[in-house]
């Protein structure tokens, strides 16, 4: 609903105050509707207009005056608050201006990160409701966002710690892009493709980056007429890529996310049908389910599975439409995985399956909502042809309901199932609710399985609303309600906590939905009722009975939970956690029931609870609280009737018991007195107006009991006072009934049954508000004057030292003061007083916004808040000076100070938890299908109340006044006092206060740091610790030690370091050491780079000016004069200069601190750590710090050395001179025209990038005329529009400079590294071991050396050379690692050296590397691998030809044994793999070299060769739009291999275990050669199973028969490597993804092998088949011939002569039936039954001595096949009994007396049937006839088991 237009008066504006509105006010974009329902709604328009006008004016001014901080941030925060309070209550024009301004601000390039994040979050919020602004209203460019993401997420300097970003930044940026995406211009898709396509090189990490960018940036919600500029430009290309990749590289998942979004935004505009089988196959594969008889999962599958959420969105968006294909596949998917949902299954895959169940219905409901109920907006609607039809919905619900019902009892709990059922019931209650109820009724009866009860109730709660409202589809729903309620009552059980809680929730949910009114009388009066209504009417007669029984149950619960054992007096104020939960459950359920009762039932219940409470005396801790809660609930519902009963009774008892004055001084009071006080204090928490009748009695009681000596007594009396004040002064709704106006109308007018499950009507909520009347307010003041005033006078005197008070008296007085304060928080105006000025300079106003919260404060009266403040402060200093150990009083004082500062009627933490529980209840009962806020009335009222509380709590960003300052200083004093508990409580309040007042931290920091000053002698250890805690902050609030502000950290960081010299500091105390550790850790974790440049570009200022000029609403403020703007710019320049000054000052002060003589080492380390945070990418570190870090490279402590290494690497990056680049035209260089369409891979126009040993630059001239391209991915997919390479040597920064040519910073480094002593020491340190056996190649040290050689070229080589030569020859682990790090740095650092220098370098390096590579050991070969890989990464291979030629010399020379050979290959592989597609020549050379060596003897070399082959063939991918590779190709290689394996393939016998491994002398026969070759080939196939992007299936198929022959059947470790590998390899190959065209090929191989003479091969075909079919389920299902072939294959193998093969065929059959790949049709059944009837030959009389035939007769085999087939059918439904099952079991049982192995098979089948059906036998029994049951019972417990 749009708001009615507002009338704007034309009165003259008051200067500066009221907002000016034009003659017709604006139309708000979207308000928060709940504001309209507040009792003071009429005042809000004026209030919000004023605020909006102020925000527009001041935000605009701040930006124009270049004041990002404090002005800009202050007013953007105000805008966030405004949105939280009023929604998007501004005109469309303002909305667009706000967005544009923030977009400009976010994209300021040098903006400080924390500001950027703040602006981004607000911008996300402004863009959140995209239906409010169409593409016509708003257009946002995409490039600024791309620059932002590139700069931050792909930062080039973050890894060197020159930038610190917060962890949250990634999500914020991605959400920001997502929010702006709908508004990108139409041409942006083409621009993005042009920008990121060149990155798409599948072997490179850039692929991941390209696809990530596509996923988050590509716009998919363009209108249909622009589709040709949108997804049509990339859809075929990317889906082609997705369909053809294998093995889930990480980016495949991101493609899925992109397609899911595309599908959702364009339902009906894309034909997905061709891809559906592939999509479902992949989704099924990505669930990683364990399948088949040999379960080896490819390890890579586990890490990169699809995100289920996106897969679900994709499926949902493709549903519907004419073809219904998706629904068919979805049904297939659930059929195939249903059995995994059975509660007896558990595994790491279960979570995914549950998430699938939970998300799918939710997603379908959202789609239905969008298609049928959502208000149309500018977003493309779904075309009629593709909307989901009713039939679609029914099919969907039917296919998912089975798994959901199974999941109800899952091991992980019933939560997901309940959420799924809730959504399914919205769509098809008639299909969903009956089966749930079927499971619920028995669960309510069972005593032995409480978890069933919990699970079913949870699910019924989910469907409650659909059940009760009884739609036309499921009219009988409501009739179940009463039986369910009555049966749930026994669940209120004192002995079972969780059962109790779920029952409360269950009863509470149903009573909220249904008026508990007895309508049975209507039957006589009306005759127009339907049958169901009649049934309901007569049932409602039971309501009264239900309520009374429920109360009896609760009374039982209460009596059993009485506090029998006396707990220790001190801490028993608290209930145990469980007790308090039960208390909460009980009281909220009871109050719901009474709210929903008719007057008649209520009166009965009231009488009952009254009688119960007055006839017992309860202890006040547990039982008393519960009873009092029940009474309070009753009184709240009908205050008049209830107070009449309770108040006189309690008043009587209390007056009676306190007649005698002795009572006042008793330490222990009478139980009855305490109980009545407790009862009275609870029942006064009701509508204040109703209490006024009893004020005399209540005041009398307060006078009698407030000053009791007994603490328990006066505390209860204070509660009474507190509740009286609250009830009379707060604003709150007085009833939460589900129908406005309640149910007390005669049945002739009102028929409650019609209101079952009815939602509240937001526009006719009819909230009954309690707004304090003048009478109530004066009563509240009367209470304060009578009870608060005297206490304040006493405490005032005590604080002045004029009156001695005992501690107990002080405590009592404080308790009364505190109760009054929190009772009247709403009544007392906030603290006044002058503000603390001069904390921050600002040119815009930073004024507070005042919100009206329903009460006009009476300012003529004395403000008790201020009186309390002054009295308490005086008292506090008195106590701290005289009796600091009176901790109880101090605790209360801390509470009082906190409430004085913040409490205006509600507490933040209570509000937060209520907001949370509101959201939970909303979720559990919402109707997502219809949307439109159709919540039940109570929930809507609650939401309005929360809106009111939100307003009372919006005090953050308050003005910081003197009085606040005083109180915060008091808190600081308490936070550093002697008692740890006092400190702890005070610190929590202190942190809350710091967060509430603007800029107060700057005022407080110096005071905290006072305690850390090293020159103070009077600081105690407690004060020191307290101060440190104050700096540390709590986990949520401010951390003073690390405010993102130069002015603050310039004080705190140096103070932390110097505090190490304070005499209060003691490193012996572990608590202090831990504090410093925590502080350092927190600073490092939370530090974000602080800005040095706060300039605002012109583009922002222009929009800011528009914002200030925007009318409706606006305040009359003059526009800024040019002088003002100049002044703003001047100030901003000063601020930049200030920041820089502060930065340098901080570095220097920290250095001073660290260099103090006797500073303990811990503080030195902390200081150096802080210094290292100050490295930046926009300023070089000051010289003194550079000198410091370089010196510390040789510090004694390894921690310091590590920090110094990082820092110096960063400094070298800062000092890096920029290298000039120029644009080239790759087509000119190659002399080829530009290709017309995209073709990736090896093309003529990128051939010049390849390594070609004929054209390698070997002379200076060739070198300088070559065009080098360093990054490996350029040119593979296509060329970028603007291809940039480094310019020639003469244009680059000068090399070989003398010391004089360098800047001072460089000289510092130059001097140290030219000094042989320094270098020697450095190398000694670097070659020490750090953590034994766990050290790895260190990227930090590599960066250090790379920087040294990049910035100073070969200046230091002479000094280093002797060290390198020495280190290389030393085979110790740490020395080898050190030299590997230096060499990698050298090779990478020499990227820009001149040819002469490079040539000299390789003359030095080649001999070094040869030595190193022959000295590798087990510990170091990894490091050399990393070294070479790092050296080659992103480098042009032509520049490294020395290295590659060296590596290829002869890797398998045999020098140093097989181990060194394997290592050399490993290192070579590392280098070549980094070069990807650019070194085909080298790959061919390597393959040629390796091929004759494939028959290697040594296992480690074979494994390594296998892995190297994977990398050699990695480039041979079959991706779409990709040219055939010039690198080695798999088919040619496989052909050559098969030729050599002929001797093995031709032979038909088994290949035996071959152990004749080592060195057979002389020529081996071909066969032995073949076996060795095969071992290597197996290693290759296993290595590539998880790595390559596409499997060359055709080639592998030719090897399959051979593997089938070798693979063993049993798992036996005595087999040799060959057999084990063959088995593993088959398992991995069977999990591979197949393309449709490969299916016939593979089936041909399988059926050929199934005729093999080796039964091992036949057996293995079956295990292979199981896995292959499941992992490619829909690809096979999509091909009818394939299904037929497989079925035929299995049926043939069922009749195999080998018993094991027959049994495995049966297992396979049952598995394929179970996942619904095959169906049990009559043809199959008849076939098996025929086989079973095969006549067996007569038994011959055997001679006693002769052995029976070992070969079974053909007849026996046939008959066995039939029995196995039937058995497979039985076992294929392990969890239910289909209609055909009983007869099959009967047929089977006929064979129990057949000869073996038939008898055994039948027994096994029966015992399995019994095992799987035992759990739900009661249910399954129904499927059998009585005769069948008799036979079955006989069989299942037949004596033959025991015979």
Curated annotation (Swiss-Prot):
Q: How is it modified after translation?
A: Phosphorylated.
Report the subcellular localization: Cytoplasm, Cytosol; Nucleus; Nucleus speckle
What happens when the protein's gene is inactivated? Mice are viable and show no obvious developmental abnormalities. They have reduced male fertility due to defects in spermatogenesis in meiotic spermatocytes and during the maturation of postmeiotic haploid spermatids. Testes are defective in core histone replacement.
UniProt GO BP? DNA damage response; DNA repair; proteasomal ubiquitin-independent protein catabolic process; sperm DNA condensation
Q: Name one GO cellular component term.
A: nucleus
Where is the segment annotated Disordered? 1-23
- Let me know which tissues express this protein, per UniProt: Broadly expressed. Present in heart (at protein level).
Q: Where are the HEAT repeats?
A: 475-519, 998-1037, 1179-1217, 1354-1392, 1636-1674, 1680-1718
The chain residues annotated with the modification Phosphoserine are 1121, 1614, 1746
This protein's assembly is summarised as: Homodimer. Interacts with the 20S and 26S proteasomes. Component of the spermatoproteasome, a form of the proteasome specifically found in testis.
Q: What does this protein do?
A: Associated component of the proteasome that specifically recognizes acetylated histones and promotes ATP- and ubiquitin-independent degradation of core histones during spermatogenesis and DNA damage response. Recognizes and binds acetylated histones via its bromodomain-like (BRDL) region and activates the proteasome by opening the gated channel for substrate entry. Binds to the core proteasome via its C-terminus, which occupies the same binding sites as the proteasomal ATPases, opening the closed structure of the proteasome via an active gating mechanism.
Family, per entry: Belongs to the BLM10 family.
Q: What is known of its domains?
A: The bromodomain-like (BRDL) region specifically recognizes and binds acetylated histones.
Please report the name of this protein according to its UniProt entry: Proteasome activator complex subunit 4
């Amino acid at each position: 609903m749009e708001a009615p237009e507002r009338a704007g008066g034309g009165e003259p504006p008051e200067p500066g105050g009221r907002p000016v509105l034009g003659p017709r006010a604006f139309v708000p974009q979207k308000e928060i509707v709940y504001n309209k329902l507040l009792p003071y709604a009429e005042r809000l328009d004026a209030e919000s207009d004023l605020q909006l006008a102020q925000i527009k004016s001041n935000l605009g001014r701040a930006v124009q005056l270049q004041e990002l901080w404090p002005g800009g941030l202050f007013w953007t925060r105000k805008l966030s608050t405004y949105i939280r309070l009023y929604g998007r209550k501004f005109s469309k024009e303002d909305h667009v201006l706000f967005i544009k301004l923030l977009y400009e601000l976010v994209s300021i390039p040098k903006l400080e990160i924390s500001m950027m994040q703040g602006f981004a979050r607000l911008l996300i919020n402004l863009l959140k409701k995209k239906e409010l602004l169409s593409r016509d209203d708003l257009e946002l460019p995409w490039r600024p966002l791309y620059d932002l993401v590139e700069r931050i997420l792909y930062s080039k300097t973050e890894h060197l710690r020159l930038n610190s970003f917060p962890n949250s930044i990634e999500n914020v940026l991605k959400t920001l892009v997502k929010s702006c995406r709908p508004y990108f211009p139409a041409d942006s898709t083409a621009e993005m493709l042009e920008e990121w396509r060149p990155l798409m090189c599948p072997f490179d990490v850039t692929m991941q980056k390209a696809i990530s960018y596509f996923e988050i940036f590509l716009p998919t919600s363009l209108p249909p007429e622009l589709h040709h500029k949108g997804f049509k430009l990339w859809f075929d290309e990317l889906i082609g890529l997705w369909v053809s990749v294998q093995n889930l590289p990480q980016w495949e998942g991101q493609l899925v996310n992109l397609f899911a979004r595309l599908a959702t935004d364009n339902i009906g505009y894309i034909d997905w049908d061709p891809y559906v089988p592939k999509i479902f196959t992949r989704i099924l594969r990505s669930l990683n389910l364990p399948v088949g008889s040999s379960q080896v999962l490819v390890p890579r599958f586990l890490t990169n599975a699809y995100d289920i959420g996106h897969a679900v969105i994709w499926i949902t968006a493709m549903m519907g439409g004419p073809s219904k294909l998706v629904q068919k596949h979805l049904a297939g998917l659930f059929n195939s995985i249903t059995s995994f949902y059975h509660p007896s299954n558990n595994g790491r895959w279960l979570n995914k399956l549950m998430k699938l169940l939970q998300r799918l219905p939710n997603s379908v409901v959202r789609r239905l909502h969008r298609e049928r109920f959502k208000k149309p907006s500018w977003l493309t609607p779904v075309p009629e042809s593709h909307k989901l039809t009713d039939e679609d919905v029914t099919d969907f619900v039917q296919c998912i309901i089975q798994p959901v019902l199974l999941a109800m009892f899952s091991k992980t709990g019933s939560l997901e199932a309940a959420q799924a059922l809730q959504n399914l019931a919205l769509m098809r209650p008639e299909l969903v609710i009956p089966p749930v109820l079927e499971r619920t009724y028995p669960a309510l009866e069972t005593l032995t399985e409480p978890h069933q009860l919990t699970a079913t109730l949870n699910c019924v709660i989910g469907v409650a609303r659909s059940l009760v409202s009884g739609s036309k589809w499921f009219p009988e729903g409501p009739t179940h309600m009463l039986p369910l309620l009555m049966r749930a009552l026994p669940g209120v059980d004192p002995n079972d906590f969780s059962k109790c809680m779920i029952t409360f929730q269950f009863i509470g949910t149903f009573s909220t939905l249904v008026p508990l009114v007895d309508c049975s009388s209507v039957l006589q009066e009306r005759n127009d009722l339907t049958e169901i209504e009649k049934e309901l009417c007569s049932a409602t007669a039971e309501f009264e009975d239900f309520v009374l029984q429920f109360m009896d149950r609760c009374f039982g619960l209460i009596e059993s939970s009485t506090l029998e054992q006396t707990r220790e007096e001190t801490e028993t104020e608290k209930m145990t956690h469980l007790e308090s939960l039960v208390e909460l459950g009980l009281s909220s359920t009871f109050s719901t029931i009474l709210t929903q009762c008719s007057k008649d039932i209520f009166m009965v219940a009231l009488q009952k609870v009254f009688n119960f409470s007055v006839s017992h005396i309860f202890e006040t801790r547990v039982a008393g609280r519960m009873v009092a809660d029940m009474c309070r609930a009753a009184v709240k519902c009908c205050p008049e009737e209830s107070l009449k009963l309770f108040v006189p009774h309690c008043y009587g008892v209390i007056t009676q018991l306190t007649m005698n004055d002795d009572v006042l001084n008793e330490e222990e009071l009478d139980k009855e007195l305490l109980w009545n006080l407790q009862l009275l204090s609870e029942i006064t928490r009701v509508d204040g107006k109703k209490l006024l009748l009893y004020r005399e009695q209540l005041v009398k009681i307060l006078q009698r009991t407030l000053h009791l000596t007994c603490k328990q007594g006066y505390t209860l009396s204070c509660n009474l006072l507190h509740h009286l004040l609250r009830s009379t002064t707060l604003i709150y709704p007085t009833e939460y009934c589900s129908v406005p106006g309640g149910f007390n109308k005669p049945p002739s007018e009102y028929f409650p049954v019609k209101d079952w499950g009815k939602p509240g009507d937001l526009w006719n909520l009819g909230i009954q508000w309690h707004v304090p009347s003048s009478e109530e307010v004066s009563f509240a003041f009367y209470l304060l004057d009578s009870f608060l005033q005297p206490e304040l006078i006493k405490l005032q005197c005590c604080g002045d030292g004029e009156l001695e008070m005992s501690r107990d008296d002080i405590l009592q007085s404080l308790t009364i003061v505190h109760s009054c304060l929190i009772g009247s928080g709403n009544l007392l105006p906030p603290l006044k007083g002058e503000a603390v000025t001069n904390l921050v300079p600002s040119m815009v106003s930073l004024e507070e916004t005042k919100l009206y919260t329903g009460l006009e404060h009476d300012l003529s009266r004395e403000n008790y808040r201020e009186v309390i403040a002054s009295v308490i402060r005086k008292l506090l200093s008195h106590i701290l000076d005289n009796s600091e150990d009176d901790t109880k009083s101090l605790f209360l004082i801390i509470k009082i100070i906190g409430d004085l500062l913040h409490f205006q009627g509600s507490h933040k933490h209570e509000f937060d938890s209520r907001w949370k529980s509101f959201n939970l209840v909303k979720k559990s009962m919402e109707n997502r299908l219809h949307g439109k806020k159709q919540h039940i009335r109570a929930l809507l009222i609650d939401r309005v109340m929360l809106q009111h509380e939100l307003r009372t709590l919006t005090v953050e960003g308050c003005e910081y006044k003197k009085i606040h300052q005083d109180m915060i200083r008091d808190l600081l004093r308490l936070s550093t006092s002697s008692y740890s508990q006092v400190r702890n409580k005070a610190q929590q309040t202190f942190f809350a206060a710091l967060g509430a007042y603007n800029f107060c931290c700057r005022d407080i920091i110096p005071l905290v740091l006072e305690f850390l000053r090293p020159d103070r002698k009077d600081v105690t250890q407690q004060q020191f610790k307290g101060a440190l805690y104050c700096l540390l902050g709590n986990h949520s609030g401010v951390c003073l030690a690390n405010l993102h502000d130069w002015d603050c950290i310039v004080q705190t960081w140096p103070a932390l370091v110097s505090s190490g010299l304070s005499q209060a500091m003691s490193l012996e105390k572990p608590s202090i050491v831990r504090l410093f550790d925590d502080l350092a850790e927190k600073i490092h974790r939370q530090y974000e780079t602080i800005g040095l440049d706060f300039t605002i570009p012109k583009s922002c200022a222009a929009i800011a000016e528009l914002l200030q000029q925007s009318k409706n609403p606006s305040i009359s403020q003059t526009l800024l004069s040019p002088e003002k703007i100049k002044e703003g710019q001047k100030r901003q320049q000063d601020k930049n200069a200030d920041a820089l000054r502060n930065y340098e000052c901080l570095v220097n002060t920290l250095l001073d601190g660290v260099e103090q003589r006797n500073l303990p080492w811990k503080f030195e380390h902390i200081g150096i750590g802080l210094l290292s945070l100050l490295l930046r990418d926009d300023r070089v570190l000051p010289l003194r710090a550079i000198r410091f870090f370089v010196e510390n490279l040789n510090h004694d402590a390894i921690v310091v050395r590590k920090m110094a290494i990082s820092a110096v690497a960063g400094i070298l990056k800062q000092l890096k001179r920029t290298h000039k680049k120029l644009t080239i035209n790759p087509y000119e260089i190659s002399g080829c025209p530009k290709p017309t369409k995209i073709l990736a891979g090896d093309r003529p126009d990128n051939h010049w990038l390849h390594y070609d040993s004929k054209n390698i630059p070997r002379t200076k001239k060739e070198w300088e005329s070559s065009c080098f391209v360093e990054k490996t991915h350029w040119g593979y997919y296509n060329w970028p529009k603007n291809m940039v390479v480094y310019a020639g040597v003469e244009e680059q920064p000068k090399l070989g400079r003398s010391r004089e040519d360098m800047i001072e910073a460089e000289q510092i480094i130059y001097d140290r590294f030219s000094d042989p002593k320094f270098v020697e020491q450095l190398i000694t340190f670097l070659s020490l071991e750090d953590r034994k056996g766990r050290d790895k190649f260190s990227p930090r040290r590599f960066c250090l050396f790379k920087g040294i050689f990049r910035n100073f070229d070969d200046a230091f080589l002479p000094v280093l050379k002797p060290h390198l030569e020495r280190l290389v020859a030393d085979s110790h682990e740490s020395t080898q690692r050190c030299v590997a790090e230096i060499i990698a740095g050298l090779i990478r650092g020499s990227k820009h050296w001149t040819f002469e220098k490079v040539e000299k370098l390789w003359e030095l390096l080649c001999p070094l590397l040869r030595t190193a590579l022959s000295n590798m050991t087990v510990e170091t070969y990894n490091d050399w691998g990393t070294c070479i890989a790092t050296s080659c990464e992103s480098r042009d291979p032509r520049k490294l030809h020395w290295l590659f030629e060296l590596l290829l010399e002869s890797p398998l020379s045999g020098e140093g044994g097989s181990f060194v050979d394997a290592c050399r290959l490993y290192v070579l592989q590392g280098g070549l793999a980094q070069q990807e597609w650019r070194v085909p020549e080298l790959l061919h050379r390597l393959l040629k070299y390796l091929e004759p060596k494939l028959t290697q003897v040594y296992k480690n070399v074979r494994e390594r060769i296998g892995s190297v082959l994977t990398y050699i063939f990695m480039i041979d991918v079959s991706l779409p739009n990709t040219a055939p590779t010039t690198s080695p190709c798999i088919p040619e290689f496989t052909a050559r291999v098969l030729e050599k394996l002929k001797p093995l393939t031709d032979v038909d016998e088994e290949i035996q275990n071959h152990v004749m491994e080592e060195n057979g002398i002389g020529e081996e026969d071909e066969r032995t050669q073949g076996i060795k070759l095969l071992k290597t080939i197996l290693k290759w196939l296993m290595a590539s199973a998880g790595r390559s992007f596409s499997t060359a299936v055709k080639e592998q198929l030719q090897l399959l028969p051979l593997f089938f022959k070798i693979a063993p059947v049993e798992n036996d470790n005595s087999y040799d490597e060959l057999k084990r590998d063959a088995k593993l390899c088959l398992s991995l190959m069977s999990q591979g993804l197949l393309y449709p065209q490969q299916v016939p090929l593979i089936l041909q191989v399988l059926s050929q092998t199934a005729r093999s003479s080796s039964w091992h091969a036949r057996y293995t075909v079956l295990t292979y088949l199981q896995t292959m079919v499941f992992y490619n389920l829909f690809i096979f299902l999509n091909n009818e011939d394939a299904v037929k072939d497989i079925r035929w294959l299995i049926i043939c193998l069922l009749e195999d002569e080998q018993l094991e093969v027959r049994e495995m065929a049966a297992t396979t059959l049952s598995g394929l039936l179970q996942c619904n790949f095959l169906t049990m049709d009559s043809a199959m059944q008849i076939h098996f039954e025929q086989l079973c009837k095969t006549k067996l030959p007569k038994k011959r009389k055997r001679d006693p001595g002769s052995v029976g035939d070992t070969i079974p007769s053909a007849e026996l085999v046939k008959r066995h096949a039939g029995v196995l087939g039937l058995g497979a059918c039985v076992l294929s439904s392990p969890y239910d009994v289909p209609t055909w099952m009983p007869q099959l079991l009967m047929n089977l049982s006929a064979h129990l007396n057949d000869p073996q192995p038939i008898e055994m098979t039948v027994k096994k089948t029966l015992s399995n049937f019994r095992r799987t059906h035992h759990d739900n036998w009661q249910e399954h029994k129904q499927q059998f006839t009585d005769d069948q049951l008799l036979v079955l019972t006989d069989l299942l417990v037949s004596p033959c088991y025991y015979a």
